[in-house]
Amino acid sequence: MLSNGISEDDLFSFLSLHKKEDLDHRYILSSMCTLPHPVAVRAHCMFMETNLGDPGLFPGTAALERLLVERLGTLFHHKNAGGYATSGGTESNIQALRLAKALRPGSSPNVVLPESVHFSFKKACDLLSLEMRSVPLGTDRRIMADKAAELIDKNTICLVGVAGTTEYGMVDPIADLAKIAAQQDIFLHVDAAFGGMVIPFLPKPVPFDFALPGVTTLAVDPHKMGMSTIPAGVLLTREPDMLDALNIDTPYLTVKKGYTLGGTRPGAPMAGALAVLDYLGISGMKAVVAGCMKNTERLIAGMETRGIQPAASPDVNVATFVCDRVPEPWKVSWTRAGHLRIVCMPHVTADRIEAFLSDFGDMYA
């Protein structure tokens, strides 16, 4: 720490130098986060000092969190869902497995999940001492439900499906998994961190949420396609009081028990998430998702005309290609199998797709 403070001008000149080192969003094609919507930024600024971890001090902010859970529960066909605002998919997935373990205690617990799960499940299983049983994917890059059923035994505490895989943008056959979960009385967690704010707004959404009786919990990230400020995730539960199984005593706060993973929890991004939902509504979100899907289709078609084949036929706005290089200064990512991966987020507009295709064509000319 500095012995003496510096002037405000010098401070912000210093900060600006480092901010300039961050990448320009115009060239970011790999991220599942995006530029926040202006109403999210405005709402965030209104609630910057609030702490959801001590709701008795911020009852208005806590009421907005309950409203956000209700809004999303309704979107996912269960208005009376329980849940809370998390820091994102990683926390939501950890908490879902923590809940599953609490509800079915045992000496050798295991979790059955697809090979395509987000790396947060490795963290969760390490923290909770859970055995990971990975289910192979079919040729369509979705979990093979019949293989999942074969891996379930008396020590299985949770079955996991993904609605919008991080690498290829696929939606697992959640309906099939839900049937298995219901038949075997197994906790089913759906990781819809990405797809949760995409699938409901598609012309023909596939079933993946609480409309399926076997689904127990669901994770969704408003800071992805919901265009909230970061970090903004939500974990939803079928039963409104289900998370009480995780309660611990919090004697020196304004509430005496708590089940959240974080202690201090920012109200600002939660308010930003709710602001976007209420500002855009169903029709507005449909327009956003339609634009992203159109850009994804255009990107795939444009790459094919340049001789580059897609690695998958995605269910959401993630495009992958059999390709080993891209032009500078575009920032992309690569799947574990070595495929080029591009996420067509709201900031990846139609003109950016055309600019990328033009640069790509020049490089391969």
Swiss-Prot record:
Enzyme class: lyase
Residues that bear N6-(pyridoxal phosphate)lysine: K224
Cofactor: pyridoxal 5'-phosphate
One Gene Ontology term of the molecular function aspect: tyrosine decarboxylase activity
UniProt keyword terms in alphabetical order: Decarboxylase, Lyase, Pyridoxal phosphate
InterPro entries: GrpII_AminoAcid_Decarb, MfnA, PyrdxlP-dep_de-COase, PyrdxlP-dep_Trfase, PyrdxlP-dep_Trfase_major, PyrdxlP-dep_Trfase_small
EC number: 4.1.1.11, 4.1.1.25
UniProt catalytic activity: L-tyrosine + H(+) = tyramine + CO2; L-aspartate + H(+) = beta-alanine + CO2
Keyword Lyase: yes
Gene Ontology process terms (BP): carboxylic acid metabolic process; coenzyme A biosynthetic process; methanofuran biosynthetic process
Domain of life per record: Archaea
Keyword Lyase: yes
Pathway membership, UniProt: Cofactor biosynthesis; methanofuran biosynthesis; Cofactor biosynthesis; coenzyme A biosynthesis
HAMAP family for this protein: MfnA_decarbox
Family the UniProt entry places it in: Belongs to the group II decarboxylase family. MfnA subfamily.
Function per UniProt: Catalyzes the decarboxylation of L-tyrosine to produce tyramine for methanofuran biosynthesis. Can also catalyze the decarboxylation of L-aspartate to produce beta-alanine for coenzyme A (CoA) biosynthesis.
The protein's name: Probable L-tyrosine/L-aspartate decarboxylase
Organism lineage string: Archaea, Methanobacteriati, Methanobacteriota, Stenosarchaea group, Methanomicrobia
